[in-house]
């Protein structure tokens, strides 16, 4: 692809994403499906703007590579060791059982046994990019089903190596015999990467961070991710596995959060590019000529994988409410199928349209997953949003709540417990199904689902409630919910959690005056105690705390985001001088009346 063509392709990708994803979100089908549909539209079987799909698909795999690096940063070796049973137990069982069943079914459709084995293994793999994206959207990361799903995906990445090695053996063209010297060199290179990463990465990043230039740190992070991906690709191993290992090696370093911040924007764009590329690869010609075969294949593929995953989740002891989420989110074919089937085709394992049919099946199965997860959500809503159980009635004597609490993480739990302790009738909206199960055991009235859905808010009693407390983790969800409440439930008193000053500004601009910055009050209290330990009288420290809070809130209201940076800096300096003057006056006054104050805490 020439430079001008590459630039044109980039513009088309961005336009497709900007046009399709917001529309898909408004239709309620999710961003992932929006990307896939955008790819179909601009691909060779749609409007035909882009024809070189294979090259773009290979490049777009970098989205998965960046995603795996960030996941590696969230784990450390000890955490990975704790997951060994689920990785090598459930993960291995899923790959083996799904491969065997799918290979058997392919043999019934006139595939040779060698092609059926390769087809079964390829179809048994799930899409790492899609599954992890959906797990984050559904709040599954903290749940047992999310941890188990990640373990299965990690084993599938590990299984890439033997699967690719199996293809030439099945084709009978394994270069007469294995070149054990070459294999040994690859193993040594892999071990060298592990040892080098373990002892060299931290000193290197420490040296780069000492320069104080943020752009260089970002460049070094990109170099690490892309370099480890290319190194693993040169060894014939999974690029995603290489960056995952690099992430794990840096998970306990002091640069973990900075690395994640540097990579995150690239990850999002490249993941979108990956999904668009998958949509472009859908061969509508094959779909049209073999429509019945493809539809049956997609249904059978999804059904077999759901059955295997559900049974394994049950054997592993996953809660019944989480099994369908776990099975549904991993029910599609994955990006590895494109690599494996291309390798098998080069070895002449497939005949006629067999490879094209398998790839169409994989692509369509990926498109079914967002829709399937919506059905699972609706099923869970019916299961958990029904009438109250008998053991919950003593806690909720009146069906009409006084307060709705959205989100029940660490922040929301404190609020909920305080309200319950004071006999307030509350209803909780939570999207983490494991948290829903736990809260119901302790008598909370809980609705499962996305709080930005108006119907769910109505079911939870928003029309009768007096207040709503929004404690969402994501600022975007908070602002969307504020807008919905102001539009559909204007009588509600809105109280919200702000993660920092930026979110506080947004809430003020939206007309929400009752909010709490999650670290502000606790930091102020600790600061007051620090002043006392430094010799300041408790009364004086208390007054300093109150003055600081009052002045900070006034600054927050005055320094709206539209102001120029220089204006904000100037106003901040002026406020600091004003605060110093207040403190000095207070100190002079307190020296005259210290004895009139009882010891505070």
From Swiss-Prot:
Keywords: Antiport, Cell inner membrane, Cell membrane, Ion transport, Membrane, Potassium, Potassium transport, Transmembrane, Transmembrane helix, Transport. Pfam families: Na_H_Exchanger, TrkA_N. Residues 400-519 form the RCK N-terminal domain. Gene3D superfamilies: 1.20.1530.20, NAD(P)-binding Rossmann-like Domain (3.40.50.720). Interacts with the regulatory subunit KefG. Pore-forming subunit of a potassium efflux system that confers protection against electrophiles. Catalyzes K(+)/H(+) antiport. This is Glutathione-regulated potassium-efflux system protein KefB.
């Amino acid at each position: 692809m020439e430079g001008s063509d590459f630039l044109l392709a980039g513009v088309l990708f961005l336009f497709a994403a900007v046009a399709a994803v917001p529309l898909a979100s408004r239709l309620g089908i999710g961003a992932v499906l929006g990307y896939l549909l955008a790819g179909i539209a601009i691909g060779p079987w749609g409007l035909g703007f882009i024809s070189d799909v294979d090259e773009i698909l290979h490049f777009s795999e970098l989205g998965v590579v960046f995603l795996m690096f960030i996941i590696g940063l969230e784990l450390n070796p000890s955490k990975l060791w704790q997951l060994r049973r689920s990785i090598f137990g459930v993960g291995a069982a899923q790959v083996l059982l799904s491969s065997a069943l799918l290979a058997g079914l392919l043999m019934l459709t006139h595939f040779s046994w060698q092609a059926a084995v390769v087809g079964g293994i390829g179809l048994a793999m799930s899409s790492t990019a899609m599954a992890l994206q959906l797990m984050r959207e559904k709040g599954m990361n903290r749940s047992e089903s999310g941890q188990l799903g990640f373990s299965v995906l990690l084993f599938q990445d590990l299984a890439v190596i033997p699967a690719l090695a199996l293809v030439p053996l099945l084709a009978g063209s394994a270069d007469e015999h294995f070149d054990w010297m070459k294999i040994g060199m690859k193993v040594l290179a892999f071990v060298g990467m592990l040892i080098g990463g373990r002892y060299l990465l931290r000193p290197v990043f420490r040296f780069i961070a000492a320069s104080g230039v943020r752009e260089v740190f970002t460049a070094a992070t990109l170099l690490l991710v892309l370099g480890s991906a290319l190194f693993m690709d040169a060894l014939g191993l999974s690029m995603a596995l290489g960056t995952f290992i690099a992430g794990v090696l840096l998970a306990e370093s002091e640069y973990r959060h900075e690395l994640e911040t540097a990579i995150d924007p690239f990850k999002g764009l490249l993941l979108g590019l990956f999904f668009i590329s998958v949509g472009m690869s859908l061969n509508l010609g094959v779909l049209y000529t073999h429509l019945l075969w493809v539809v049956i294949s997609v249904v059978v593929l999804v059904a077999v994988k759901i059955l295997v995953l559900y049974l394994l989740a049950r054997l592993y002891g996953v809660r019944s409410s989480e099994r369908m989420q776990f099975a549904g989110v991993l029910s599609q074919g994955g990006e590895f199928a494109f690599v494996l089937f291309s390798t098998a085709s080069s070895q002449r394992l497939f005949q006629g349209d067999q490879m094209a049919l398998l790839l169409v099946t994989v692509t369509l199965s990926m498109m079914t997953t967002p829709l399937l997860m919506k059905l699972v959500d609706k099923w869970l809503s019916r299961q958990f949003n029904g009438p109250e159980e008998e053991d919950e009635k003593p806690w909720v004597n009146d069906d009409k709540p006084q307060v709705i609490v959205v989100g029940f993480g660490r922040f929301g739990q404190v609020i909920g417990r305080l309200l319950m302790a004071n006999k307030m009738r509350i209803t909780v909206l939570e999207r983490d199904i494991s948290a829903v199960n736990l809260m119901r055991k302790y008598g909370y009235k809980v609705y499962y689902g996305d709080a930005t859905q108006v119907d769910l808010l109505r079911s939870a009693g928003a029309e009768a409630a007096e207040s709503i407390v929004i404690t969402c983790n994501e600022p975007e969800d908070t602002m969307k919910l504020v807008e919905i409440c102001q539009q559909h439930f204007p009588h509600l008193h809105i109280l919200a959690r702000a993660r920092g000053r930026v979110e506080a500004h947004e809430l003020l601009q939206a007309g929400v005056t009752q909010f709490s910055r999650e670290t502000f009050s606790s930091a102020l209290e600790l600061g007051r105690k620090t002043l006392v330990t430094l010799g300041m009288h408790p009364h004086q420290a208390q007054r300093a705390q109150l003055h600081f809070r009052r002045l900070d809130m006034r600054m927050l209201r005055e320094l709206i985001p539209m102001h120029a940076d220089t204006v904000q800096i100037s106003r901040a300096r002026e406020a600091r001088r004003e605060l110093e003057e207040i403190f000095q006056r207070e100190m002079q006054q307190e020296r005259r009346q210290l004895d009139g104050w009882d010891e505070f805490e």
